[in-house]
C-alpha cells in the first residue's frame, strides 16, 4: 500500500520481469530467483493482472484468455486452433472463479470488472501460485469490488498467494 507515485506498480513489474531490478533479491518458495521477463515469471508460477487492462475487445473471452497459447489439433498435415477445446476450457476456468460468462462473448461487450475477472481466470488457468493484482479496484463500482473480493477470498482459500496493490487504506 502507498500513495500514488510511491513505486508499487514499478516494484510489481520488477517481480514480473517487465522491468530489470537494479538492487535487491527475490525469493520464491525459499529459493533465490532471477526473473528476466514475463515468460520466466509465468514459468515460475507468477501471474499479473495489470492496472491497465489490455483486452482485445473484438475477440471473444476465450480468445483473450488464450492469446499466444491457443490449444491446437492436427488437421491433416497442419496444426489448427482447437476452438471447441478452447471454449470448453475457458468455461471451466470462468466457472472456477465463480464468473460463468459466455466464452464466446466479445470482450468489448463486458464491463471493466468482468474483464478483470477474465484476467484473473486467465491467471488461474496458467496454474499461477502467486497472482499480482495491481490496483484492481481503481475503476470498479462498490458491487464490482465486492465481487472481486469474493474471487480473491476464494483464491486465497485454495492456497494461491496474492500480492494486492492499492492506495486505498480500506482495502
Question: Positions of the model-derived regions?
Answer:
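Glycine-rich phosphate-binding loops of nucleotide-dependent enzymes
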Residues: 1-171
Amino acid at each position: 500500500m502507498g500513495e500514488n507515485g510511491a513505486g508499487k506498480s514499478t516494484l510489481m513489474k520488477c517481480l514480473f520481469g517487465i522491468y530489470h531490478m537494479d538492487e535487491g533479491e527475490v525469493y520464491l518458495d525459499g529459493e533465490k530467483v532471477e526473473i528476466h521477463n514475463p515468460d520466466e515469471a509465468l514459468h515460475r508460477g507468477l501471474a499479473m493482472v495489470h492496472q491497465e487492462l489490455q483486452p482485445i475487445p473484438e475477440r471473444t473471452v476465450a480468445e483473450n484468455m488464450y492469446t499466444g497459447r491457443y490449444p491446437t489439433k492436427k488437421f491433416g498435415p497442419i496444426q489448427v486452433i482447437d476452438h471447441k477445446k478452447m471454449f470448453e476450457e475457458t468455461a471451466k476456468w470462468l466457472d472456477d472463479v465463480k464468473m460463468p460468462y459466455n466464452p464466446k462473448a466479445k470482450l468489448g461487450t463486458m464491463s471493466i470488472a468482468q474483464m478483470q475477472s477474465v484476467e484473473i481466470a486467465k491467471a488461474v488457468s496458467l496454474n499461477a501460485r502467486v497472482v499480482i493484482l495491481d490496483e484492481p479496484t481503481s475503476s470498479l463500482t462498490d458491487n464490482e469490488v465486492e465481487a472481486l473480493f469474493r474471487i480473491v477470498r476464494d483464491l486465497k482459500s485454495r492456497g494461491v498467494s496474492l500480492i494486492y496493490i492499492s492506495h486505498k487504506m480500506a482495502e
